[in-house]
């Protein structure tokens, strides 16, 4: 019964709409100007304000200093008996605390309660510009403390930025973090926890085992060793860094000399966010050293990571022969992780290597060459040794030249759309199928007008592209040509002629390619290339029907009259964009959508504009919404959930690699193509982020806690939304606020509600992944560590899942629509009538804001 009830709840939920917070001037702002009075806050005022703010949902995670800062921004308002304070249905922008008097609350013109001193109202207005759920009128003369949303959220942003920058400065000063990357240091900064100590309170005690690093942000602390005062630490000092690396007793006692605040980092949280610090530091050193090598810099990133993982790390005392020319057997390369070593050739010193330096390129390139050097430690040191076995395990063989050759081919073909999403197996088969051919100066490699069947990559030399006897350009090493011949039987559009002697090319024949690439992937590639090749103008499009409708306009099914190729045309009303102040968002949506190039993300063909609309011409996706699909399927099986969640992960991972946060992930924004594979659509909420974003945007039920709290967020918010989607797939309803329409109550449940699971959900791996995706602390959320999506892909939930086959379209989707399915089917005449009405009102447009559209 519980399963049926929850399935019913999930099926009955309405489609959820995104919200955009903005700080436009409202009627409420105008009203408050008439009641504002200047008044200095007394200590009892500040105490009351602080108490009220601490009980406020949005302020629940703020520390005392942040609460005090916000208190200082509260303004004083005076009302006479009968004065209106806020009105039900109007957009709100203030949060209030009653200082004196009584205020009546009305819902739908019915009085429901009276509030007095210390009570607060308008909490939702601090989050975004939602409509007021009640009217409040002064019953008696009274006064309020109030703060405007824009001031409140700007203050939160300022406090958050200041705190992050200050903590990051402290992190930069800790020597143990010197070898970390910028991204890794930012991860640690986000993991900092502020701890306050009273004067005389012990921070760490000599002899105790510790796992926390402390950095003094405020105050002073005294260091004692064996009860003897050694020194006083001040702001910026740090202690306990060895606790992050080693499990050993504290070497001193440290006591707060005055009220002291410390930024603290514990080993457990650091391991979650970054991994074992010592391992990370050594891996960074090894990777950087390998990238400096003339040999290893030609390896792929994955191969370098594998080498770092398989390298043997050893400690050596001072004055020790680490490698002797007469005794070395399998070691081919060394990297100094700590300390210094001296390098000898024929007993003559030829140099000193310190941390981060490496040696051995010649022995890697020619592994049969005897080791002629001796390496001796000058001090205690730690060395990474790369052996023949390490190289063989990493590369699959000991032939370095062949491996570099393979890497070159792979890096070239992965740049091309038709090869980019091949499975590893398909990619390997394709590369193995390449053959080598040579040409002399003046030889025709391909002839204009002939039907081609080969694809070429230039291994060495130069060729000329000639069309109608006119030289167009010259191609050189690692350039390619003729790829269309693998998909289409069509004449070559130009000739390719060898420019010099001994031009070497790798080539593969169409017959071989078609043996490797078959079925859904081949069909997908053919359609994608054909769509991109077609040149489309607005007047060449003819509308067939309306297939979607939203806040800003409609989506039409159109066809290109010359070629009959069908597309989707998203028509966005300029009036709606201007009225809702979304000019920057629509420009950003165009920029992001134009750059996207992934099989699980909607493909933009081009954009148009006229006096009334912006137009996005995209590929046509005919399989309906995932929202409807999961209702047809019922509660998803594990394999079905793996398919859909895995597909969404690949799309979101692609965006995050480009520093794009999507911010509105939900089944309504995912379509299914005719093969049953996903397409992520609608980038109206997406944003490119370098640091952190602060705007409240997205669909409330899918919003991460950090979006609501207003202290800054990044790509972690999409990981939270993955957890909401997975819960919906497996459990039925939404995990937070499923039965709520009041946005404040939805937000309250997201921030404080308990995550529970129906009794019929028994798979422990599924439950564990949902819990870890829906971790309220972003730094503890799976997928948000330095490993990124790898941690999610490696989770036991996906233990039997083939990611390679998913990317290669070799899996059977849970649902393939038997006919074309769209979100809407609206009569075209109805839309045309509305468009005609639109002409009657002039646009309040800004000059040239859309000039680049």
Curated annotation (Swiss-Prot):
The keyword Cell membrane does not apply. Optimum pH is 7.0. 3',5'-cyclic GMP 1 binds at residues 113, 122-123, 125, 132-133. It comes from Plasmodium falciparum (isolate 3D7). Residues 541-798 form the Protein kinase domain. InterPro entries: AGC-kinase_C, cGMP_dep_kinase, cNMP-bd_CS, cNMP-bd_dom, cNMP-bd_dom_sf, Kinase-like_dom_sf, Prot_kinase_dom, Protein_kinase_ATP_BS. Gene3D superfamilies: Jelly Rolls, Phosphorylase Kinase, domain 1, Transferase(Phosphotransferase) domain 1. Activated by cGMP. Not activated by cAMP. cGMP binding allosterically triggers a conformational change at the alpha C-helix of cGMP-binding domain 4, which bridges the regulatory and catalytic domains, causing the capping triad, composed of Arg-484, Gln-532 and Asp-533, to form and stabilize the active conformation. The cGMP-binding domains acts cooperatively to activate PKG. Residues 58-173 are annotated as: cNMP-binding domain 1. The cNMP-binding domains 1, 2 and 4 bind preferentially cGMP. The cNMP-binding domain 4 binds cGMP with the highest affinity and is highly selective for cGMP. The cNMP-binding domain 3 does not bind cGMP but is required for cGMP-dependent catalytic activity. The cNMP-binding domains 1, 2 and 4 can bind cAMP but with less affinity. The autoinhibitory segment (AIS) interacts with the active site and inhibits catalytic activity. Residues 295-398 are annotated as: cNMP-binding domain 3. Its main location: cytoplasm. It comes from the Eukaryota. Its cofactor is Mg(2+). 3',5'-cyclic GMP 2 binds at residues 473, 482-483, 485, 492-493. Residues 418-517 are annotated as: cNMP-binding domain 4. One of its GO terms (cellular component) is extrinsic component of membrane. ATP binds at residues 547-555, 570. Autophosphorylated. The gene is PKG. GO terms for molecular function: ATP binding; cAMP-dependent protein kinase activity; cGMP binding; cGMP-dependent protein kinase activity; metal ion binding; protein serine kinase activity. One of its GO terms (biological process) is signal transduction. This is cGMP-dependent protein kinase. Pfam families: cNMP_binding, Pkinase. Keywords: ATP-binding, cGMP, cGMP-binding, Cytoplasm, Endoplasmic reticulum, Kinase, Magnesium, Membrane, Metal-binding, Nucleotide-binding, Phosphoprotein, Serine/threonine-protein kinase, Transferase.
């Amino acid at each position: 019964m519980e399963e049926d009830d929850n399935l019913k709840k999930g099926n009955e939920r309405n489609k959820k709409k995104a919200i955009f917070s903005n700080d436009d001037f409202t009627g409420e702002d105008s009203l408050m100007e008439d009641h504002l009075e200047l008044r200095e806050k007394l200590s009892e005022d500040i105490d009351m304000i602080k108490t009220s703010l601490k009980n406020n949902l949005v302020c629940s995670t703020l520390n005392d200093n942040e609460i005090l800062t916000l208190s200082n921004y509260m303004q004083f308002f005076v009302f006479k008996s009968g004065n209106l304070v806020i009105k039900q249905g109007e957009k709100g922008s203030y949060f209030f605390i009653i200082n004196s008097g009584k205020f009546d609350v009305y819902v739908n013109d019915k009085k429901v309660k009276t509030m007095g001193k210390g009570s607060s109202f308008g909490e939702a207005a601090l989050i975004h510009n939602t409509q007021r759920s009640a009217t409040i009128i002064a019953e008696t003369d009274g006064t309020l403390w109030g703060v405007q949303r824009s001031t409140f959220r700007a203050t939160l942003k300022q406090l958050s930025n200041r705190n992050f920058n200050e903590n990051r400065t402290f992190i930069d000063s800790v020597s143990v973090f010197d070898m970390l990357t910028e991204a890794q240091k930012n991860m640690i900064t986000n993991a900092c926890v502020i701890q306050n100590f009273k004067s005389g309170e012990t921070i760490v005690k000599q002899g105790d085992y510790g796992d926390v690093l402390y950095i003094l942000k405020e105050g002073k602390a005294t260091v004692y060793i064996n009860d003897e005062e050694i020194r006083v630490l001040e702001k910026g000092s740090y202690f306990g860094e060895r606790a992050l690396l080693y499990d050993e007793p504290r070497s001193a006692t440290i006591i707060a000399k005055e009220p002291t605040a410390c930024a603290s980092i514990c080993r457990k949280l650091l391991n979650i966010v970054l991994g074992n610090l010592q391992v990370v530091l050594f891996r960074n050193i090894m990777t950087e050293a390998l990238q400096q090598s003339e040999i290893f810099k030609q390896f792929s990133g994955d191969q370098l990571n594998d080498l770092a993982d398989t390298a043997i790390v050893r400690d050596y005392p001072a004055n020790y022969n680490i490698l002797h020319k007469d005794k070395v057997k399998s070691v081919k390369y060394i990297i100094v992780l700590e300390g210094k070593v001296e390098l000898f050739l024929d007993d003559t010193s030829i140099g000193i290597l310190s941390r981060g330096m490496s040696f051995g390129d010649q022995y890697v390139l020619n592994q049969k060459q005897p080791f002629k050097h001796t390496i001796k430690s000058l001090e205690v040191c730690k060395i990474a040794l790369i052996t023949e076995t390490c190289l063989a395990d990493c590369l699959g063989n000991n032939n370095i030249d062949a491996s570099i050759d393979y890497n070159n081919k792979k890096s070239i073909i992965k740049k091309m759309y038709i090869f980019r999403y091949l499975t590893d197996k398909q990619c390997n088969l394709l590369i193995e199928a390449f053959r080598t051919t040579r040409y002399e100066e003046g030889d025709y490699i391909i002839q204009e007008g002939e039907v081609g069947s080969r694809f070429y990559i230039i291994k060495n030399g130069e060729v000329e592209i000639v069309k109608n006897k006119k030289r167009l350009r010259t191609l050189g090493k690692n350039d390619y040509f003729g790829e269309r011949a693998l998909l289409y039987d069509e004449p070559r559009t130009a000739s390719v002629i060898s420019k010099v002697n001994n031009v070497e090319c790798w080539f593969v024949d169409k017959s071989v390619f078609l043996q490797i690439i078959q079925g859904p992937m081949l069909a997908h590639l053919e359609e994608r290339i054909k769509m991109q090749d077609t040149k489309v103008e607005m007047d060449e499009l003819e509308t067939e029907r309306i297939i979607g409708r939203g806040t800003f306009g409609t989506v039409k099914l159109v066809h290109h009259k010359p070629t009959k190729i069908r597309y989707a045309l998203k028509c966005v009303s300029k009036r709606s964009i201007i009225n809702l102040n979304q000019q920057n968002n629509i420009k950003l949506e165009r920029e992001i959508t134009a750059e996207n190039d992934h099989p699980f993300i909607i493909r933009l063909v081009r954009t148009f504009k006229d006096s009334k609309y912006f137009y996005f011409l995209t590929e046509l996706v005919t399989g309906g919404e995932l929202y409807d699909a999961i209702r047809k399927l019922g509660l998803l099986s594990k394999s079905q959930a793996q398919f859909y969640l895995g597909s969404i992960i690949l799309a979101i991972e692609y965006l995050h690699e480009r520093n794009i946060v999507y911010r509105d992930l939900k089944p309504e924004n995912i379509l299914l193509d005719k093969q049953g594979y996903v397409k992520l659509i609608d980038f109206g909420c997406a944003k490119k982020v370098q640091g952190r974003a602060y705007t409240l945007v997205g669909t409330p039920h899918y919003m991460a806690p950090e979006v609501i709290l207003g202290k800054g967020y990044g790509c972690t918010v999409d990981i939270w939304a993955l957890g909401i989607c997975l819960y919906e797939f497996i459990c039925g309803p939404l995990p937070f606020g499923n039965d709520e329409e009041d946005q404040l109550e939805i937000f309250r449940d997201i921030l404080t509600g308990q995550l529970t699971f129906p009794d019929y959900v028994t798979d422990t791996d599924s439950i564990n992944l949902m819990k870890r995706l829906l971790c309220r602390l972003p730094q503890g959320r799976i997928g948000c560590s330095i490993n990124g999506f790898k941690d999610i892909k490696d989770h036991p939930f996906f233990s039997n899942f083939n990611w390679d086959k998913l990317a290669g379209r070799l899996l059977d989707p849970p649902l393939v629509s038997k006919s074309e399915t769209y979100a809407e089917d609206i009569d075209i005449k109805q839309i045309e009538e509305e468009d005609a009405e639109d002409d009657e009102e002039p646009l309040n447009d800004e000059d040239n804001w859309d000039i680049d559209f």
